[in-house]
Structure formats: structure tokens, C-alpha cells
Amino acid sequence: IVGYTNAGKSTLLNTLTDAGVLAENRLFATLDPTTRRLSLPGGEPVLLSDTVGFVRRLPHGLVESFKSTLEVATTSDLLVHVVDSTSVDPLGQIDAVHEVLDEIGAGHVPELLVFNKADAAPDEAARLAREHFGSVAIAARTGEGIDLLLRTIGDRMRAITAVVELLVPYDRGDVVAAIHREGEVVSTANEETGMRIRARLASASVGRLSAFVVEGAK
């Protein structure tokens, strides 16, 4: 979850996962990323991480100091970009976030725009969502639009995931646990050299587990 400061990122994470993250109207209220597991409507598990709020013309030195905090964005499969619909310049805030994402090397990560605070500015949130194809208008504080958001995340994640087969040695329970944690296990079979697991995984997970992927498996 990324976005300009005070866009409602922590509130959204709390609404989706009961994470108990501090949600305040002040600069850098969130400094360390909080990650929580969430099951999408189709049953697929995902990991959601909150990040520090971005601001315009963030000094390069400050970007460097926050790089470890922001690094989670560079390894994500999808960026849920939360935008404050009550802002006087929401498009400028979107551009500011994109600038920081480019600077930290996350500009290539697929993005889902989420126009928040529809409870306070319903017409503006709806207008922004109409003008940005594939985006969603929500009110994280009240829960309005959350069901649609979850379905949209599920659709986007399915579009960037693949079913792969992995052969994991029996002494690598940590790898088996990671597959269950990061993806959706379709089937398992015990073989002489290890457990063959067929699972739906995002591209980043496939990369991390590449040593166990069975090439050419159907």
C-alpha cells in the first residue's frame, strides 16, 4: 500500500486486516512497514504492507534514509496506490508518489489506483475513479467500496500470477511453508526425491523459489 501522506493507507490496512497500525493526520506517522496476511474473496492469500507516506519534492537524502522502509514496494507484485479524494490537488499527489517510486526503483511495479475518502467527497471520488480506468473509489474509514476493492485486487493478482510446479526436498519444510504462505496450493504429491507441489504464485515468489521450480511442467 503506497500513497501520499495522509491519504489513508494505514486506515485501509486496519480496515482490511485489523492490523492496529497507528493512523494519524501527520507527516510520517508510519515509519516502519507493517505486513499482514489477507485472504481475497476467491480464497487466495496475499500479504499487505503499509509504507511511509510520500510528499512532494522529498529530499534525496530523506529518500535514501527511508529506502529500507520503502524497499517493500520494489519487491511487491502489485502497488495499491491510495489517493486522498479530498485533496485540492490529487493528480499532483499521484505524480509525486510516482516520482518517489521511480527513484527507489519501483516504477515498473503494476499499480491499482484507489481513491479514498469517498465518504467525505463522494462526487470527487467517483469522478476520479471514472477518469482513471480500472481504479476504485472507497472510504477506508467506513468500509464503503471495500468489497469491490478486494475483488479488483483479486482480479489483478490473478492476471499477474501463474500456476507452477515445484519439487521440494523433504528436509526443506521452510520452503513448503513459504509456498503455502505466499501462494495457493493446488495439489501435492510425494515423490522419491521430495514433495511435488503445484501452486499459484506471483512472479516475485516464483523468482525467490526458482531453485525448486520444475521447468517445462504442465
Language-model region placement:
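Short, flexible active-site loops
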Residues: D77-D84, F133-A137
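C-terminal-of-GTPase-core extension/linker across diverse P-loop GTPases
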Residues: I1-N14, D18, V88-G92, E99-K218
